[in-house]
Structure formats: C-alpha cells, structure tokens
Swiss-Prot record:
A Pfam entry, by short name: Methyltransf_29
The enzyme's E.C. designation: 2.1.1.-
Uppermost EC category: transferase
Residues carrying covalently attached carbohydrate according to the record: 101, 409
Name the UniProt record assigns to this protein: Probable methyltransferase PMT5
Record has Nucleotide-binding as a keyword: no
GO cellular component: endoplasmic reticulum membrane; Golgi apparatus; Golgi trans cisterna
Cross-referenced InterPro entries: Put_SAM_MeTrfase, SAM-dependent_MTases_sf
Keywords (A to Z) from UniProt: Endoplasmic reticulum, Glycoprotein, Membrane, Methyltransferase, Signal-anchor, Transferase, Transmembrane, Transmembrane helix
Lineage: Eukaryota, Viridiplantae, Streptophyta, Embryophyta, Tracheophyta
Lumenal side: 42-606
Organism of origin: Arabidopsis thaliana (Mouse-ear cress)
GO molecular function, a single term: methyltransferase activity
Length: 606
C-alpha cells in the first residue's frame, strides 16, 4: 500500500536530477547527524572532567539546531514545495519593515526612546509571503534624474506631512500630481545647501567645500538627514555620506533618501550602539536632528565620539544653539553650550562657530586622555567584540586601537593587498555587468558576446554587496565609471573587514543575515553576494527567509547576482522560483565548482 512515505519519495523524483541528488545527499547527512547526536553527546558527558566539554556541547547543540532548520527547509523542498510560489502579503505590508514594531515595543515595557530601537527579539512568528509594491508604484528614474525627481507613489508620505515638514532639509520642493521634485538649491540654512557646505568648509579652514577631501574628510555620518539634500550635495563632491534616521511609519527620511539614490539606512542610538566599529567616520553631521545630547550620562555624545575618527569633526546646527540674552555673562542654556561642556571631558575642541552652526574637532593625540582630570569620563576596556547593537557604554572607546590615525595624516587612498582583489574586482564586474541584460532570459540564453550592447552605465544606482569582504566590487564599480554606490555589508560572524571598507572611503555596515536588514521595501536596484549562502550554512538561518528578505528590499525589475558552489546554487535557484524571480545558472567555465545565479525580479502589478 502506497502511503505518505511513497508519495514523498515520488515528489523528490519529480525534481530536477541535480537537485534530487543534492537533496538525497544532504537529507541523509542531516538524518545521520540527528541519529548520532545523543550518542555523541553521551560520549562527551562521560568525559566531563575536561574544561572543553561546555564549549563542545554548546557548539554541537548549535549544529543540531542548524540541522533541524535545514531539515525543515529540505523537507519542504522534497515534498514538492519548490514548485509552489510564496503567496502575496496583504496591503498592510506594502511598506513593512521587520523588527520595528513601536506598539509592540511599548507593550513589552520599553520606553524613553527604546521603543524606537530595533528589536528583532520581539518579532512574532514570521509570515512567509512576498511583499507587493503599491498600486501606483513606478520604476524609479535613472540617475542622475532620479536624484531630483521621484514618483510620489513610491514613498509613503501624505501631502499634509510633506507641506508641514519644518526641517531645514525639506524646503523649496514641489509636490506635483505624481512626482516630488527636489531643487538643487533647497534652502538648507541661510542661502542654500551649497552655501551651508561652503560655510562648514570655511569653519574647518578650507577655501571651499571642494577641498573637504584634502582635509581628510571622505566619509560623513549624517544623523537625521531630512530628505537628503545635504547628502546629495556631498555625493556631488565625490564624498560618501551615510544617512541614518529612526524608523518612521510614514514620511520616512531614509525611504526618501534611498528613493533618490542616496546612501541611507534606518538607525538610531537611543539605547544601542550603531552597527559600525570604533573610528569609522571622518565627520558626523547633525542639522536639527532632534537629539538631546546631555541625557543618559552623555552616552549619546560618547557614541558619536566612538564612531568618529581621530582628528574628525562633529557639526551641530540648530536654531536653539543661539545664546539666550545679549549680555556676555548671560547664562547660556543652548544645546551647543551643553555639548561644549561635555566635549572638554572627551578631548574635543570647539574649532569654530558661525550663527547656528558649531564645529568641534576630536583630538588626534591619544595622550590627551591620560592628561585629563580624574573626574573625566573613563576609558573603555576595548576588546575584540563586534559592535552589533550592543548597549551604549558610559566610557570613551577606541583610544588603544591600532587604527588610531588622524584623518589628516593617513594616505590619500587606503587599500588592501588581498589576493581576492583581482578575483572579485574588475574581471568579475565585467563578467557580471555583461549578464545584466534580457538576453539571458530568452529561450536560448547565451553569454553576451563583444558584439552585444552592454547595459547602460546608469541602469542601477543602489547596490548592496551582502558579503562584501574588502569592498572590491565597490572599487571595481568606481574604476569602471558606473554611477552606483554600494552598501557593503559584512556578516557579523565573518571576518570583520568593515574597518578596511570604511578606511577606503566606502559605505558599509555590520549585519546578521539571520535577521532582516534595516531598510524599507524596494530600496535596492541590485543585490550581490559571493559565497554568502555557503557562509550562512553554519548559521541558524533559513535560506527561505533570506530570499524573502532579499525580495522585500529589492525593487521590481531589480537584479540579484549570487556566486557560490554548484550545489548551493541549485538550491538557491529553486528558492528563486518560489519568489517568482527569473533566474539562470551560469557556468564560469573555469574548471571550478563555482556557478553564478543571475536573477531578475519581475514587476508584478496589482
């Protein structure tokens, strides 16, 4: 009698031969691990006198947990689920960002700003569904036109929110019938964003804002970036700004900045450290960012100090910076006054002040900290831990780091001698770029030849390298003159190469791919990952959930390029079909077991 076991086996034989063989092999290994786990655990228990036993047991338990996750995923594939596409999510998830449930956080007892933080631990059971775009969504305009004009239906903002916005970065923009237009001169303080940037340059001692790089300023952390006007100007100066702002259900600064093709991500530091290592940025900028700097034992300002490089600058602009009263001895209660009092305790110096803008410079001499009074803020005992949303600390970080190098003294171009530079650099980029064409999705796909036209240099703008290593894909894009920027993501359990990426002047962040990425849906044009799937095989992650997350952050008609071992790529192709991507596996023809999976997300309209 043919029971459920026979049907399961029959469904496996219905899959493609390569997937079928792979599934049998992996399921067999998982079953063997599950059967032998108790025996192995007992053998370790019998030698409990060894100090290694707790670590061995903990690591083995982690393997068993991962085996269970893999088994469930493989079982669903073996039962024919690979032929079943994920359902579409409801309308309420069109702008859904996981891990930011303010209502749920309040119910959990979080308050004083912590309810606005990222809390993946409170996520309910995941609903496996594909997030659809809004009914009036349109493909963004190509860069640079898309920097100044975006479709209003692509962002979640009401007309009243737009018109009532009072931040210094949101003036003189036009909300037309279905477009939002950003002027190059959009009223950012005084006579415009260019004048504002020039003023900051003069406060540093430069002739103009075109000389920022000469002063060592290449990377800028922009806190509360409004609609991205300041960041857009810095991009035009070939600098790398990264906008961070708290999660907003509507009228999001981060969503608007990314829609304009500007680097941004959801982030705040009310109670947790930012996912960047110490000494990451050359400048931190806050223009009416709404931060109260002197609360929580000044830990918010200490977090700015942690990510600021030696010799770097902190720019604070706010109308409340003006002193109250006209007499010299009038007691000042402005934000800048309170920050200045704290700055003396952390070896910052007030370099300049003009109107509502104040500029502090962090010391480049680490001996300054030992010469302070005993009442000053203590130094942290810096370790090797990765700063991935750790609690804020009431101490000064990075003073003993080998990367303590003044931004004015470092080499003009930081790089790496990695052997992977050539493998994952220009040659790989040319290979990938030639594949971004509808030719591979024809009935007879082929590798484009020299006679085939390449995609335009500006067909994509927002790129995410999900396993960035040293940022070599980013470097290759720049060398080839592509009009794209890259969010270089370093997995938390991989080698921490983010300091190298940031020292090269690129954007980057630490992230755990077992969790959703802190961004809004449809914010990236291309996702790239080299051997990420193999790396995640040792983590407690579900590849199904990873592909759903990739689909969430990828815009319609966006691209995915995955490079990995042939077995993993075959499994990835099955998952790509479940999220409705058009996919092709490309043999690199180099004698290795590496394959490319090139996918394009279709634009499925309602």
């Amino acid at each position: 009698m043919r029971g459920s076991w026979y049907k399961s086996v029959s469904s496996v034989f219905g899959l493609r031969p390569r997937i079928r063989g792979l599934l049998f092999f992996i399921v067999g290994v998982v079953a063997l691990v599950t059967i032998l786990a108790p025996l192995t655990s007992n053998s370790y228990d019998s030698s409990s006198s060894s100090t290694l036993v707790p670590n061995i047991y903990s690591n083995y338990r982690r393997i068993k947990e991962q085996a269970a996750v893999d088994y469930l995923d493989l079982r669903s594939l073996s039962l024919g689920a690979s032929l079943k596409e994920f359902p579409f999510c409801g309308k309420e998830r069109e702008s859904y960002v996981p891990c930011y449930n303010i209502t749920g956080n309040l119910l959990a007892g979080l308050q004083e700003g912590e309810e606005l933080d990222r809390h993946c631990e409170f996520e309910r059971e995941k609903e496996r569904c594909v997030v659809r775009p809004p009914r009036d969504y349109k493909i963004p305009l190509r860069w640079p036109l898309g920097r100044d004009i975006i479709w209003s239906g692509n962002v979640k903002i009401t007309k009243d929110q737009f018109l009532s916005s009072g931040t210094v970065t949101t003036r003189l923009m036009l909300l037309e019938e279905n477009q939002i237009t950003f002027h190059s001169e959009d009223g950012l303080v005084f006579d415009g964003v260019k004048d504002y940037a020039r003023q900051i340059a003069e406060m540093i001692g430069l002739g103009s804002d075109t000389e920022f790089a000469q002063a060592g300023v290449r990377t800028v952390l922009d806190i509360g970036c409004g609609f991205g006007s300041f960041g857009a100007h810095l991009v035009s100066l070939k600098l790398m700004p990264i906008c961070i702002a708290e999660y907003e259900a509507t009228g999001s600064q981060v969503q608007l900045a990314l829609e304009r093709g500007l680097p941004a991500m959801i982030g705040n530091f009310f109670s947790k450290q930012l996912p960047y290592p110490a000494l990451s940025f050359d400048m931190v900028h806050c223009a009416q960012c709404g931060t109260t700097w002197d609360i929580k034992d000044a830990m918010l300002l200490l977090e700015v100090d942690r990510v600021l490089k030696p010799g770097g600058y902190f720019v604070l602009t706010s109308p409340t910076n003006k002193a109250q009263g006209n007499l010299p001895d009038t007691k000042k209660t402005s934000i800048s006054t309170r920050v200045n009092e704290l700055s003396k305790k952390i070896c910052w110096s007030l370099t300049a002040q003009q109107d509502e803008t104040f500029l502090w410079q962090k010391t480049s001499d680490s001996s300054c900290y030992s010469s302070r009074s005993q009442a000053s803020i203590p130094l942290c005992k810096d370790g090797d831990s990765v700063p991935y949303y750790h609690p804020l600390v009431p101490c000064i970080s990075g003073t003993t780091s080998k990367r303590w190098i003044s931004i004015q003294n470092r080499s003009a171009v930081a790089g790496t001698t990695s052997a992977g530079l050539e493998i994952h650099g220009k040659s790989a980029l040319k290979n990938y770029w030639s594949l971004l064409t509808p030719l591979i999705f024809s009935d007879h796909p082929k590798r484009p030849g020299d006679e085939d036209p390449l995609p335009p240099f500006n067909m994509i703008r927002n790129v995410m390298d999900m396993h960035a290593r040293f940022g070599n894909l980013n470097a290759a894009l720049l060398d080839e003159g592509k009009s794209a920027w890259v969010m270089n993501v370093v997995p938390v359990n991989a080698r921490n190469t983010l300091p190298i990426i940031l020292d090269r002047g690129f954007a980057g962040v630490l992230h755990d791919w077992c969790e959703p990425f802190p961004t809004y849906p449809r914010t990236y044009d291309m996702l790239h990952a080299n051997e990420l799937l193999t790396h995640l095989s040792s983590e407690r992650c579900s590849l199904m959930d990873l592909f759903l997350e990739m689909d969430r952050i990828l815009r319609p008609e966006g691209w995915v390029v995955l490079s990995d071992k042939v077995g993993v790529i075959e499994m990835a192709r099955a998952l790509a079909a479940r999220v409705r991507w058009e996919a092709r596996v490309i043999d690199l023809q180099d004698g290795s077991d590496q394959r490319l999976l090139v996918c394009q997300k279709p634009f499925i309209k309602k």
